[in-house]
A protein has these predicted regions:
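Short beta->alpha junction loops
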Residues: 1-9, 130-140
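Conserved donor sugar-nucleotide recognition element shared by glycan-biosynthetic enzymes
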Residues: 7, 11, 79-83, 110-113, ...
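Short, well-structured alpha-helical segments in soluble
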Residues: 8-24, 89, 139-153
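Mature extracellular/periplasmic domains of secretome proteins
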Residues: 15-20, 40-44, 146-149, 173-174, ...
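Extracytoplasmic ligand/sensor domains, especially the bilobed periplasmic-binding protein
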Residues: 23-132, 180-207
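Hydrophobic alpha-helical
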Residues: 32-43, 139-140, 149-175
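Extracellular/periplasmic ligand-binding modules, especially the Venus flytrap/periplasmic-binding
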Residues: 116-118, 165, 209-222
């Protein structure tokens, strides 16, 4: 096992070192961008690779050539699935017709979910009143959030990782952006990064095995 620090270049370096050590299969990566780099690299070795959490469709399928990455396997859903389902939930289940989106630009995961949410929400008849982006490493989102506030959305889709989501929710609260936020599986891990008040009426899409925690399920249904 090696730590690639969430970086695509470092992931390939770690993979090369492990190949020199004689590995015959690869479990990983965790997030989308380094996994995409490893998918391409492992194909050159014809090495089996499985990821439990990278959701970009391109991890297992090359749309440009319409070919499946035959050595790469995924044990989770995809960005299109998440983005589409959250748009369906927002429009059909929650009844929202005006949405805004805030996401990190240049990030495969964030952009993938945002694109699919926007396309599905609009196809259902909803209106995307604003799309705001930020750069990797940013910690101040108030400018984007203030712009969103001025567009008066009923809901905000925030397909980012939990560290940034915690900051975004806190800053949204501080400027009075009091609408529900929705997200993807990158929100999983928010405990300790956001308060219960900030997460009121918030929803996100994540992996869950039905029947794995019957006590909780029964208590929730009750």
């Amino acid at each position: 096992a090696m730590d690639e620090q969430g970086d695509a270049t470092q992931a390939v370096t770690c993979f090369t070192k492990m190949c020199d050590q004689g590995i015959t299969a690869l479990v990983g990566d965790v997030t989308t961008t380094p996994t995409l780099a490893l998918a391409a690299e492992s194909a050159d070795y014809n090495m089996p690779m499985v990821t439990a959490s990278a959701t970009a469709e391109a991890v297992t399928y090359d749309a440009e050539t319409d070919t499946v990455n035959e050595n790469v396997f995924r044990a989770t859903f995809t960005d299109p699935f998440q983005g589409i389902k959250m748009a369906d939930y927002a429009y059909q289940r929650l009844g929202y017709t005006k949405a805004a989106v805030i996401f990190q630009k240049g990030a495969d995961y964030n952009e993938g979910l945002a694109e699919n949410f926007v396309n599905e929400f609009e196809s259902l008849g909803g209106t995307i009143v604003d799309q705001e982006t930020y750069s990797e490493g940013d910690v101040d989102y108030k400018t984007q959030l203030t712009t969103i506030l001025g567009k008066a959305p009923e809901v905000v889709f925030c397909p980012n990782y939990y560290q940034e989501v915690g900051q975004i929710l806190a800053q949204a609260e501080s400027i009075g952006l009091a609408v529900p936020f929705l997200g993807g599986d990158g929100w999983d891990g928010l405990e300790g990064y956001a308060t219960a008040d900030q997460l009121k009426d918030a929803y996100f899409c994540a992996n869950y095995a039905k029947g794995s925690n019957p006590d909780f399920e029964n208590a929730y249904k009750a």
